[in-house]
C-alpha cells in the first residue's frame, strides 16, 4: 500500500470520530425539535469516510489521458460540501430558499470543477472560471445573505460566526491547491496534492460537526425557551 493509500485510510478513521460526535450530539438533544434535522450532520463525516475507504483501495480512480481522476473525491465533495454550507445557513436561521440556493451553487462549483479536471486547453480554464464564479457566490451567501437572517441571540450568533469563518477560510484553500496541482499549473505532485486534500477534508468536516456539539446549548436552550422553562442565557 502506497503513502497516499495509507493517508486515505487514516483520514477515513478520522471521519469515524466525526460520526461518533454527531451521535453524541443526537443523544444530547432528546426532545429538541431540531434533533432529527441535526442528525443529518452524520452524512458529512459518514459519506466522507466511506469515500476515503474507496479511495484508499483505488475504487473509482481512473486515468483520462495524462490526468488521474479520483472519482470518489469529487463524489464526496458534491454530496458533503453542499451540506456544509447548507447547515451554516440553517444555523443562521436562513430561509429554505437561501439554503437551497447555496447548496445548488456549491454542487455546481464541484461539478464544473470536475469538468475542468478532465478537459484540456481553453475549455479547462473556461470551466475553472465558471467554477470560480460559483465559488465566489458561496462567499456572498456566507458573508452577505446569511448574516441578515441570524436572530438576535448571542449563542446563535456565536455558532453562526464560528461555522461561517471555519468554512470561509478553508474554502479559500481548495482552489489554490487545485491550481498548484497536476490538474492546474502542475507546480505540485499528485501525491502532495492528494495528501493536502485529505488534510483539508478532515479539517473541514470533523471540527465542523464538533462545533455543533460544543455549542449544542443553542438548540437545547431553544427547546427550553419554547416551553417557557428558562430565560436567555449568555453566550459561551
Swiss-Prot record:
Biological-process GO terms, alphabetical: phototransduction
One Pfam assignment: Bac_rhodopsin
Subcellular location: Cell membrane
Intervals, Extracellular compartment: 1-3, 57-70, 119-122, 182-189
A GO MF term: monoatomic ion channel activity
UniProt topology in membrane: Multi-pass membrane protein
Keyword annotations: Cell membrane, Chromophore, Membrane, Photoreceptor protein, Receptor, Retinal protein, Sensory transduction, Transmembrane, Transmembrane helix
GO cellular component, one term: plasma membrane
Annotated InterPro entries: Arc/bac/fun_rhodopsins, Rhodopsin_retinal_BS
Record bears the keyword Acyltransferase: no
Residues carrying N6-(retinylidene)lysine: 205
Cytoplasmic side: 26-34, 93-95, 151-153, 223-236
Transmembrane segments: 4-25, 35-56, 71-92, 96-118, 123-150, 154-181, 190-222
Similarity annotation: Belongs to the archaeal/bacterial/fungal opsin family.
PANTHER family membership: BACTERIORHODOPSIN _OPSIN, NOPA (EUROFUNG) (PTHR28286:SF2), PTHR28286
Protein name: Bacterial rhodopsin CSR3
Amino acid at each position: 500500500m502506497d503513502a497516499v493509500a495509507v493517508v486515505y485510510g487514516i483520514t477515513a478513521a478520522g471521519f469515524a470520530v466525526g460520526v461518533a460526535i454527531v451521535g453524541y450530539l443526537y443523544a444530547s438533544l432528546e426532545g429538541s425539535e431540531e434533533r432529527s434535522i441535526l442528525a443529518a450532520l452524520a452524512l458529512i463525516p459518514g459519506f466522507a469516510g466511506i469515500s476515503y475507504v474507496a479511495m484508499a483501495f483505488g475504487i473509482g480512480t481512473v486515468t483520462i489521458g495524462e490526468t488521474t481522476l479520483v472519482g470518489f473525491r469529487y463524489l464526496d465533495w458534491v454530496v458533503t460540501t453542499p451540506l456544509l454550507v447548507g447547515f451554516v445557513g440553517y444555523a443562521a436561521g436562513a430561509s429554505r430558499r437561501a439554503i437551497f440556493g447555496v447548496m445548488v451553487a456549491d454542487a455546481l462549483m464541484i461539478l464544473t470543477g470536475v469538468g475542468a479536471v478532465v478537459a484540456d486547453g481553453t475549455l479547462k480554464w473556461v470551466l475553472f472560471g465558471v467554477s470560480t464564479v460559483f465559488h465566489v457566490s458561496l462567499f456572498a451567501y456566507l458573508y452577505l445573505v446569511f448574516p441578515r437572517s441570524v436572530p438576535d441571540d448571542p449563542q446563535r450568533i456565536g455558532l453562526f460566526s464560528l461555522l461561517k469563518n471555519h468554512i470561509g477560510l478553508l474554502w479559500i484553500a481548495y482552489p489554490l491547491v487545485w491550481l498548484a496541482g497536476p490538474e492546474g499549473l502542475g507546480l505540485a505532485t499528485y501525491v502532495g496534492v492528494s495528501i493536502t486534500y485529505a488534510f483539508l477534508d478532515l479539517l473541514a468536516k470533523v471540527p465542523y460537526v464538533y462545533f455543533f456539539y460544543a455549542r449544542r446549548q443553542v438548540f437545547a436552550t431553544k427547546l427550553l425557551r419554547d416551553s417557557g422553562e428558562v430565560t436567555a442565557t449568555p453566550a459561551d
